[in-house]
């Protein structure tokens, strides 16, 4: 496995953030590759066991798509996800505003605390279809901050090599100072 060699090539105190396979977050159909969700989980964790055992895993990142709205079904799915990953560190990136609206933000934070997830702190352009920067710590053991940049010009542009342009952004000193506080 490719990543096994990484474990010996990084400094002793280096830790990896591993993005979950899209089957866990609805960005791929796990049914196309696995007979059950449990089989998917077992294969995923078995593959990453050397990283987990070495202590090089910082956390798993579950980046949910914007279609993952704040619904009872999706809350139940997050509970299932916690069961699948037991006590392993998992950071949850929610990309739909419904989780952050006035009606649900406190419930979202409490859900993350209850399930022992870290709600990812995301800095991205502030547009009608993006999520606000929420720096609330929901897991006292670890937090994850993702700097997507503030490139408003290309954020919603889905033409050409849009993925490369979308996050093409260099923070200035003033922005970094504010984010560092």
Question: Model regions: which residues?
Answer:
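Residues lining hydrophobic/aromatic ligand-binding pockets adjacent to catalytic sites
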Residues: 1-181
